[in-house]
Amino acid sequence: MLFSKEREMSDDLTKEQRHKNMQNIKSSDTKIEVLLRKALWQKGYRYRKNYKDLPGKPDIVITKYKIAIFCDGEFFHGKDWEVLKPRLEKSNNSEYWISKISRNRERDEEINKKLLFLGWTVIRFWGKDIKKNTDECIKVIEEAIFDIKMGEDKISFDEDGK
């Protein structure tokens, strides 16, 4: 059986069709980002979106508390990598996808380290967690805010010498 060089994925799309599909994948204002932002807004939290002044341009930033939030898609950010990678190794374009997703994972880790070094709290959510458990995601953010507030209180308390 002969395979066309046009077919690089394990589906029936041509190279041009695949290219068009990949171009249409959104990098900002995705459904999961909008869902989480709406939930935060309803709770009274104000934020900036796609904040360019920070490494990695976080999807949501609560500047008041120095919290950077990322809404990561499972495939492109390599959720369950130990399961996904062997599956990708069997695909037609395995080298490309393994390299791309591995680099995404490395970049995510580099961004986390840079933000932590700058004194930011980094929170990453998987898309499915946002969709299925939005309230739990909000609780995680609220717990981070509480911890930050408690840390500020301790600092000011200690500075007063009491």
Model features per residue range: what roles?
Residues 1-124, 128-162:
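Nucleic-acid endo/exonuclease domains
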